[in-house]
Structure formats: structure tokens, C-alpha cells
């Protein structure tokens, strides 16, 4: 999807994600995992934001693409173990101060394409909870099951 630049798959992948989400109720906000601006420039798109836009269009809540900020570029996490991924992401993701009002007391759907070790999701959840999110549900279409990540 992302490495093959097959962005036309976003609607299908979002429908797969949407099928597993609880019905939209109350104060729900869709927030994609952020990429650093350099990575967006290199890739040309944020794959999580594309999925988030599709979830929004499917009626799963408003989309806030800029709620989370990747403060500094991080190297690709592929090949790193769980602890190395967590160290790499430490302090790299924060909540944009201007979006605190939208996140406070909201049920956030955090969107990403793949959940590998959970380090990126954990960093995002911490930032959202610090901003007052009532709950955070992680929504992705794929999960890596690799014992090598446990190292």
C-alpha cells in the first residue's frame, strides 16, 4: 500500500477497518498517525491520513489530520526491535496545542496502516491522553506478528 504507492487501495482498506469499528456515537474524532513533514515530502502522502479521510467519508466521525505532530524526523523503524522502536519514538509525537479543545473528552479513533510493535501507537495514545482524550481506539488494517520484535 504505502511503499508500492498504491493509494487507490485506501477506500477498500478503510472499509475493512470500518467493519470492525463500533458505531459512531457521541464526541468521536478520527486522528491519523502523523508523519514528519520530510517523510510526507519524500513519499508524497500520509497513508494514515488517506485511511482517516475514507473513514470520515464512511461516517465514522470528523477527521483531524493535524491533531498529532511528529516533532522530529525518525529513521524508518523496520528492522528495529520493540525497545529500539520505543526509544526512537520517545518524545517524537505530541498533540498540537491548537487541537486540545477538539481532543479533550473525545473518543479518538487513532488510524494507522500497520501495527508492528505498538511503539508508534503507544506514543500517539500517550499524547492524546495527555490532551484529555476520553478514550483512544487504535484502528489499522494489518498487524505484524513477529517474535523478533519482542527483543
Residue ranges and their predicted role:
Residues 1-110, 117-151:
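Conserved PRPP/pyrophosphate-binding segment of the phosphoribosyltransferase/PRPP-pathway fold
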